[in-house]
Amino acid sequence: MAHFTDKLVLGAWMLEQFGVETLETFKGLLADPNLVGFDEENTSLFHYELINKPFRARAMSDDTLRLYDENIVRHWRRITERRNQAGSTLYPLYFQYLALLFTEHYLDRYFTDRATLCADLNAFREQFNTDLPEREQIEPFQERDLNKLAIWIATGGGKTLIMQVNILQFQHYLARARRAREFNRTILLTPNEGLSLQHKEELDLAGIHGDLFVKDGGSLLSAGAVEIIDIHKLKEKSGEVTVAVEAFESNNLVLVDEGHRGAGGEDWMAKRNQLCDNGFSFEYSATFGQAIKAASGSELAPTRAGQSPSKRYKLVQQYARCILFDYSYKFFHADGYGKDHLILNLKEEQLAEQRQLYLSACLLAFYQQKRLFADRHKALLPYLLANPLWIFVGGKVTAKNEANAETVSDIHAILQFLARFLANRGGESVEFLELLLTQRDDLRDERDRRIFGKAFPYVQTAWATSQARELFQDLLQVVFRAAAPGLLHVVHLKGGGTGEIGLRVGENDWFGVINVGDAAKLIKQLDADRDSNMVVTDQTYATSLFERINKPDSTINLLVGAKKFTEGWSSWRVSTM
């Protein structure tokens, strides 16, 4: 069976429009870091490469390419003007530029002659299908469906910047076609309220007027604003805090951020389709592939007459014809971006007995980042690195179940580790650091290889093998903001509606914060545990530690939480997960 990425017919057609077959060809031409930027004539350096090294059969002239580039540069300068006031000038990277270039060409064709565009796409589709098995072939493009585009881009790839330029690109081509009066609103759909708030802040930075939806709050009357609403507030009928889809009418520009994560697939798609009926939509996601896999049924076309196709088949057909640009994680990571996964595969029999030593090694790896950031701060300035932050994302918050009364939640287990490390009873933590410093820890994988053998080069340069105690003292100061070992204070912060749990050693500054949906329940479980290394209390505290994490004066080095904070939250600080 062909892979889903091999069925992206719209993306393949767009590559052919520029005379290439794969994204890698573009990468070879444009990925040089020296090509990032604009010249004194407000032309991108990428443009000169595209003009000077034309591919075998480009569908547009040099003059058209220049117009596309002028539009991209103009829009980019607008959305980054305020952002650049922070001190660093933002320019599009090659894959961001290509996403915008592809959008330029598509919108140009779409608003010039939609019927001819549809005919050209179907002519290409016929040839494209010859490489696919019969039951996996792509169904014909329909003119009525050409108003839906999707951008597949990995998390961290600049999706928000691309979306904001797409708004300006669409407005430009709409005005050129003299159809601006035909469109009612620009609506941005998000999967949750947290992401709505984040988009509001990002639109403000871009100089684009955005309004959060407030039931009966007048936001629908803000002329020209991007109206931001999470998908759960759209219903068939209006309620106390919800609004009927029909209240927004049709003929809208609809922007969808991770739509399939906010509601059931068919549910949100029906709402999106109603909103953009006779309008247009852009959809953005890092996880189109996962959405396809999660859908039920087969990717193959039905074999019997009258048999309904599966949800998965319908999703494949839809996205194959609307994903304009694929820069999913495999491309992102191959370019040196994203996360480096360290899959350690500790021997199963070692996992329980050596958990404390294993997590101490994880802590030491984070300390190494903090120490390096402090020691080499000036040298690291050009790389725009932020103060390192360690995060734990737990799958379970509280977990006492009937099957196993001793079950400990992920978050509870992390707190037990921290409390035991900070207590250093019998010098255990110092002993563990010495084992790691001297490479005598004996933590091995299933192939009997030392899993932390090359993990601490900077620590081993900074500290002699005999200095484990001094290393422990410095680690306490750098990570935990403490001068000496002590009890872990787990404090339920009441007041201000934060629902957070603060972490500190004794009465020292906060070094960590727990952000979960039910803080009171977790506190109750911790209190019942009676851990001798942990003090569980509560305190009236109006300021949110979580919301201040990105502030320069934040003392927080550790963030522990569940899914609550993974959506609608962004931080350049995250360096260890």
Which residues does each PLM region occupy?
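Conserved Walker A/P-loop ATP-binding site and its immediately adjacent core
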Residues: 161-162, 177-205
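Conserved pre-motif I regulatory segment
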Residues: 54-152
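Extended, charged/polar low-complexity intrinsically disordered regions
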Residues: 1-88
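Walker A/P-loop NTP-binding motif
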Residues: 102-107, 160-179
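Walker A (P-loop) phosphate-binding loop of P-loop NTPases
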Residues: 156
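Inter-Walker segment of RecA-like/P-loop motor cores
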Residues: 204-239
